[in-house]
Design a protein with these regions (language model features):
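Acidic, turn-prone loop/beta-hairpin segments
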Residues: 2-9, 13, 132-133, 203-219, ...
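Structured secondary-structure scaffolds
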Residues: 1-201, 212-241, 251-260
Length: 316
């Protein structure tokens, strides 16, 4: 008659049937011939078949991804030892009391059943911010401030959009308004990168340019690890400014392309093949800085007297 009737405690837990057809259309429990029909207090009732929220699926998918061809276990112990835990969980603030909470609960339940190795599924958790409309408000069709990324890609290219998003600000925890002037600036920068080969010189490269490249590699590598993509992009821009002024060697040019590749994958692929390379730039080793080249020849030390800066000493 449509009444909701709770299952008596003595009948808990309600176990699911094992002879379900998982390949049927719709909900397998709905298609089962007998399971959903039962009695409570001698009254015939129909069990609820919509039993699992979609958050249940997203609470353990990573355990299956690492061993998705295993037909004996949902996730083997060896696969979990090789891959788990998830290094970093990125999500919005709304996940804190929703998906994050559910997936941690699910992991602890699986741990209690002896099916997983760790009590916690994630090593670290970071909030990511929102891209706001040009007016500084959350994008909304009703406000007319929605930026369509597909339209932007068609207008200025995927690399420009990707690199502009990286340049907007620190990735973690902040919101940033879309700025058409900002994305135009990134587009101009990539056009300069496209023409950087014109500044490759046959002569010996200027020492300061070589030093700056190795410093840039250090900075970009460190910033990527700390999710500070905006300052990594800034360092790349500073290097291009220097290279355009002094010229750069072919080796430095190739190192720079490999360094830029994660930020502008399509442009760097084209530039890489233009050098006569037979393999993708994305199959190459990431550039490594030489500390002896990157090291400063002079160090400035502040001199303090009674806690106040009184001067500086420069040592070579």
């Amino acid at each position: 008659n449509g009444d909701i009737i709770p299952v008596p405690k003595k009948d808990l837990p309600v176990t699911l049937p094992k002879d379900v057809d998982l390949n049927c259309k719709g909900n397998p429990l709905d298609q089962h011939p007998t399971w959903k029909y039962t009695k409570i207090n001698n009254e015939e009732v129909i069990r609820e078949t919509d039993t699992l929220d979609t958050f249940v699926d997203s609470s353990w998918y990573f355990l299956r991804y690492i061993d998705n061809e295993n037909t004996e276990h949902f996730s083997s112990t060896q696969a979990q030892k090789d891959w788990m835990q998830v290094d970093t969980y990125f999500g919005g603030a709304e996940h804190t009391t929703m998906h994050l909470l559910y997936s941690r609960f699910w992991q602890k339940a699986l741990k209690r059943l002896g099916l997983v190795e760790h009590k916690e599924p994630y090593v670290s958790r970071h909030n990511r911010g929102l891209i706001l409309g040009p007016d500084g408000n959350k994008m909304s069709k009703s406000k007319g401030n929605v930026i369509d990324p597909d339209e932007q890609v068609a207008l200025v290219g995927a690399d420009t959009v990707k690199m502009y998003l990286a340049f907007m600000g620190p990735y973690i925890g902040a919101n940033y308004p879309w700025d058409n002037g900002g994305i135009a600036g990134i587009h101009r920068f990539l056009e300069r990168v496209y023409g950087l080969s014109d500044h490759v010189v046959e002569s010996i490269e200027h020492n300061e340019t070589t030093k700056l490249l190795h410093k840039t590699i250090e900075k970009v590598t460190r910033d990527i690890a700390e999710y500070k993509f905006n300052t990594a992009v800034s360092a790349l821009m500073i290097y291009v400014n220097q290279a355009e002024k002094t010229g750069l060697s072919k080796d430095s040019y190739e190192m720079f392309i490999r360094l830029l590749a994660p930020f502008a994958p399509h442009l760097t692929e084209e530039l890489w093949y233009s050098l006569g390379k037979s393999e993708s730039v994305h199959a190459q080793l990431y550039p490594v800085s030489d500390p002896s080249i990157a090291a400063d020849e002079e160090v400035t030390i502040g001199v303090q007297i009674n806690g106040k800066l009184r001067g500086e000493i420069t040592l070579s």
